[in-house]
Structures are given as C-alpha cells and as structure tokens.
C-alpha cells in the first residue's frame, strides 16, 4: 500500500484525554478495541458514555467498563451528546451476521442473528453538518431510505477492492452507488482494504 501513496493512520489510545462519547458500530475487533476502552477509562476525566449495539456493550462490560456507562443502542434510537444529536440506523454489514460473538453459540446456517445486536450505523447531526457513519456496511438499496430520511453532508463508508470470490467491503462502484443513494455531498472511504490483501 505504501507505493500507492496510502497512509495508515493509527490513533494512540493512550493519547486520548478529552472525549464526549465513544461510538462503536460493530463487534469486530478492528472497531472494538480493549486498549482504547482501557485508555479512555484511565485517561479521560469525564464519565463519557460508551455507545454501541448489544454485543459491543456486552464486550465492554466484560472488559470492565461500568454497566452504567454502556449505552446499548438499536436502529431508531436517538441520543443527545452535548449539542450533537446521534440517530442510530440500520447496518448493512452482512459479515457481522456470520461473526461469532462472545457468550453466544457459533452462528449456524439456519438461525439468522439479529443484525441490530451486532452492528449499527450512525447519523451524527452537528452545527457544522450531518455525518453518516456506515461502519462496515456492504452496498444496500436501503441506503436510499437513509438518504431520504437525513440531509447527509459527509458519508464515511467502508471501501476495498475485493479479491475474487470475496465480498467484505464496498468496491469503488458500490461506494458511488451508496453516495448517490445517500444523496451526500462528500464521501470519505474507510478501511481501505480487507485483511486478505
């Protein structure tokens, strides 16, 4: 990736000192990190909320985050953090459906788990504009519902050119279709690749 001019940005969890809330979209550990949770508990003076779907908050509590600081969310929930309004929306991360979660039996071919327990997306309304964070959502025609429901300025979407026989993130074509469906002004690609690459 270096020869493509792509630079990975790594956040030092120990440098986090001032934060209003921690939002996590899903249970995968490239999103949900023990070191980040521990650093926030140790270094941030405020008792900020840890916000995420059920399996995310379950994991935080297993790591020692106090139950009263964990806010379990589902699509349709609206949370106010200071002057910022956060609306929880559906996730379209099919990979989250086949991920084993702590304390749960392995996923079977016959029982489809509840996506909302595993993965969500967020619409964050600020005084500067509205941000949509799709987590690791794959392309879905349902993006158009979210585009109609919210005036989205910036969309954060998971991007990767998938190798043959694997679809883990949105391709460049999917990102374009998602941006059109969300009717957003700017797209910022996240993830930028998949683990097999």
Where are these regions (language model features)?
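Metallo-beta-lactamase
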Residues: 52-128
């Amino acid at each position: 990736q270096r020869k493509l001019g792509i630079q990975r940005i790594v956040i030092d969890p120990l440098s986090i000192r001032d934060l209003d809330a921690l939002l996590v979209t899903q249970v995968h550990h490239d999103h949900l990190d023990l070191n980040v949770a521990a650093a926030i508990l140790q270094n941030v003076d405020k008792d900020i909320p840890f916000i995420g779907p059920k399996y995310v908050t379950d994991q935080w509590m297993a790591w020692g985050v106090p139950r009263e600081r964990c806010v379990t969310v589902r699509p349709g929930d609206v949370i106010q953090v200071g002057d910022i309004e956060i609306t929880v929306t559906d996730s379209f991360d099919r990979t989250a459906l086949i991920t084993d979660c702590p304390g749960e039996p392995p996923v079977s071919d016959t029982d489809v788990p509840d996506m909302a327990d595993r993965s969500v997306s967020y619409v964050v309304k600020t005084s500067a504009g509205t941000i949509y964070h799709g987590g690791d959502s794959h392309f879905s025609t349902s993006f158009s519902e979210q585009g109609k429901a919210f005036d989205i300025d910036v969309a954060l979407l998971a991007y990767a050119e998938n190798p043959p026989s694997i679809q883990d993130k949105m391709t460049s074509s999917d990102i374009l279709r998602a941006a059109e469906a969300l009717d957003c002004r700017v797209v910022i690609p996240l993830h930028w690749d998949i683990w097999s690459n």
